[in-house]
């Protein structure tokens, strides 16, 4: 009898595994069929993450034949909404739309309730955008070379960002450290207060996304000096890159991506990836993304994973080397 049990045990294990795999496969083939699909925008309404999520909402609903809704769950630089998605059932009905803070939060917030790499699966990289270093139009800084000269002088140069640990803050720390420049960081509580002071000349320099800065450039109240990406921005084609300005290889883009809970069936991630890529190939959607200063990227889940991992590694070193802490 014991011999028979020992013989049956491996067979039972194989059978259980086959049932599990078959169940997951059937679930993936039937997706989407049972409920609303949620896109969790991990920042409050009105910002770029919210707007990106809402650009995806209606086209995805039409393509999938299933209701897709945006749910805003902001706070802690996107960590609260991301934690909710990481803890959601991996059934293809909950996704996160995240910002570049997702690549920084693991280094700034050691007590996160989720593992950014293990508990979430990248679906697609939506797009990237340059950060823009700008100054008041009446400022003494006419070019980025003027900023470099001031930052290398005893007095240094002050700049404002949307907050400590933001991509703008980390990019300026990386820039200063790589070239022996001294910058004084002035953190603000968001883009609105930052740009109000920058336009008024209360802070000499401001760094923010194209989405944040360009309206003030268009109104002639701000002068753009340089962008932080390796290529010029189509939205600010006359503004040089840091690479062109003597800092070869410097590339610090803002970015947006869609993630799923880990263990979401690969077939569902593949399908969602294909559907989002299809949305972004729509000329009208691409035009609306461009209006926000976002350069559409798209691509495979694996390409998104490689990009996000690289961002996490880059900024983890900057945070550690400069002892940067979140607000």
Tell where the protein language model's regions lie, with residue ranges.
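Short coil/turn segments
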Residues: 42, 46, 100, 131, ...
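N-terminal (or domain-start) structured segment
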Residues: 28-118, 155-157, 164, 180-205, ...
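Bacterial N-terminal signal peptides that target proteins for export
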Residues: 1-12
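Bacterial N-terminal signal peptides
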Residues: 10-21
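Hinge/capping helix and adjacent helix->loop/strand transition within the periplasmic-binding protein
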Residues: 36-37, 87-93, 107-193, 242, ...
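Sec/Tat signal peptide C-region and signal peptidase I cleavage site
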Residues: 22-28
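C-terminal lobe and pocket-closing loops
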Residues: 128, 213-282, 310-313
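Extracellular/periplasmic bilobal clamshell ligand-binding domains
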Residues: 300-326
């Amino acid at each position: 009898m014991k011999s028979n049990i020992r013989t049956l045990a491996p067979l039972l294990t194989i059978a259980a595994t086959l049932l599990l795999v078959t169940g997951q496969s059937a679930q993936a083939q039937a997706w989407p069929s049972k409920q609303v699909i949620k896109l969790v925008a991990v920042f409050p309404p009105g910002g770029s993450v919210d707007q990106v999520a809402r650009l995806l909402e209606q086209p995805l609903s039409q393509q999938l034949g299933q209701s897709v809704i945006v749910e805003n769950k902001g706070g802690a630089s996107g960590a609260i909404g991301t934690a909710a998605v990481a803890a959601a059932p991996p059934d293809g009905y909950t996704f996160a739309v995240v910002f570049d803070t997702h690549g920084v939060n693991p280094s700034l917030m050691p007590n996160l309730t989720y593992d950014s790499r293990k508990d979430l699966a990248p679906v697609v990289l939506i797009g990237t955008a340059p950060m823009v270093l700008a100054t008041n139009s009446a400022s003494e800084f006419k070019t980025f070379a003027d900023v470099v000269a001031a930052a290398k002088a005893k007095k240094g140069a002050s700049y404002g960002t949307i907050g400590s640990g933001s991509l703008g803050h980390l990019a300026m720390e990386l820039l200063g450290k790589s070239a022996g420049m001294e910058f004084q960081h002035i953190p603000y509580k968001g883009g609105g207060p930052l740009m109000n002071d920058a336009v008024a000349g209360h802070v000499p320099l401001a760094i923010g996304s194209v989405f944040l800065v360009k309206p003030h450039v268009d109104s002639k109240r701000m002068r753009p000096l340089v962008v932080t990406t390796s290529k010029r921005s189509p939205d600010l084609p006359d503004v040089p890159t840091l690479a062109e300005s003597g800092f070869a290889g410097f590339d610090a883009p803002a970015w947006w991506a869609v993630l799923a809970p880990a263990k979401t069936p690969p077939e569902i991630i593949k399908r969602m990836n294909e559907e989002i890529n299809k949305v972004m190939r729509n000329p009208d959607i691409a035009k609306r993304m461009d209006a926000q200063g976002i350069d559409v990227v798209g691509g495979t889940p694996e390409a998104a994973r490689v990009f996000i991992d690289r961002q996490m590694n880059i900024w983890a070193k900057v945070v550690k080397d400069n002892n940067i802490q979140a607000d």
